[in-house]
């Protein structure tokens, strides 16, 4: 059953169901439950939390509860680019190994799309699309991939960059921001353009970005995660991966995924 309510609300729980024979029919038979497919094997379902906001593991099964992922933290050392031979490879034009005609997808905290390291030589964005899962504007016409958030496509991002160049507010066109900086760091290391003496591993690649929304409070409570610690739901990550795959198929280009999150589960 398609979702016709806001599945990002705190009183809506999410769970992951393996698509075994009869699973889809069983979900459709339940009232107040909607679902969307993560891939050919897994279904993400959504329903209203009980009044006590407690998860009944015995009836749901532990594996159906989305696990939480955090940011992989560490000092960024760009000297590693030389140590792995990336800069030497880029210096050999005959290899054509700069990532051209390849998509790199990011599932993280978003991206600073105004940064010059994500623009081509003409000043246009190299980002093909950004799915901002946190966006609640409700005006998205491009997001046919999931039932929440907003997808900003290349022409919109270029329009925002042009506005910024003209002294206007770019975020009135593309509201997405990377307030953490983690996603921007991951993208700049792996795909930064030649800028002020810096270059990433694949400066010719195009980018697809998913800004994950923060996990719901009931899952933080269940896994004893502090409120000030970034935490992201497994179900949102699965949908993000589907978005990247679907968009890459739409563009007809190979896809590499950078995933800078981790979990103790």
Regions found by a protein language model. Name each.
Residues 49, 73-78, 134-140, 239-243:
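Short C-terminal domain-edge/linker segments immediately following a structured domain
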Residues 241-265:
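Short acidic, glycine-rich surface-loop motifs adjacent to enzyme active sites
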Residues 190-194, 240-245:
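Short, well-ordered amphipathic alpha-helices
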Residues 91-235, 252-256:
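Subtilisin-like serine protease catalytic core
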């Amino acid at each position: 059953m398609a979702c016709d309510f806001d599945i990002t609300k705190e009183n809506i729980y999410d769970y992951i169901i393996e698509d075994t024979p009869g699973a889809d029919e069983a979900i459709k038979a339940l009232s107040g439950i909607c679902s969307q497919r993560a891939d050919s094997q897994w279904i993400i379902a959504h329903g209203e939390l009980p009044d006590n906001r407690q998860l009944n593991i015995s009836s749901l099964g532990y594996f159906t509860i989305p696990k939480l992922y955090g940011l992989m933290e560490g000092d960024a050392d760009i000297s590693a680019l030389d140590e792995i031979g990336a800069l030497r490879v880029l210096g050999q034009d005959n290899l054509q190994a700069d990532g051209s005609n390849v998509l790199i997808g990011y599932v993280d905290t978003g991206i600073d799309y105004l940064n010059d390291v994500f623009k081509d030589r003409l000043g246009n964005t190299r980002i093909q699309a950004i799915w901002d899962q946190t966006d609640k504007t409700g005006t998205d016409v491009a997001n046919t991939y999931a039932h929440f958030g907003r997808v900003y496509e290349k022409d919109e991002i270029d329009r925002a960059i042009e506005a910024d160049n003209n002294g206007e507010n770019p975020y009135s066109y593309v509201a997405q921001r990377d307030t953490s900086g983690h996603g921007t760091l991951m993208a700049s290391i792996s795909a930064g353009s030649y800028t002020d003496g810096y270059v990433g591993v694949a400066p010719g690649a195009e980018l697809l970005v998913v800004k994950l929304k923060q996990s719901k409070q009931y899952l933080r409570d269940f896994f004893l995660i502090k409120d000030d610690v970034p935490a992201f739901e497994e179900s949102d990550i699965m949908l993000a991966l589907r978005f990247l795959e679907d968009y890459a198929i739409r563009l007809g280009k190979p896809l590499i995924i950078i995933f800078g999150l981790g979990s103790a589960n």
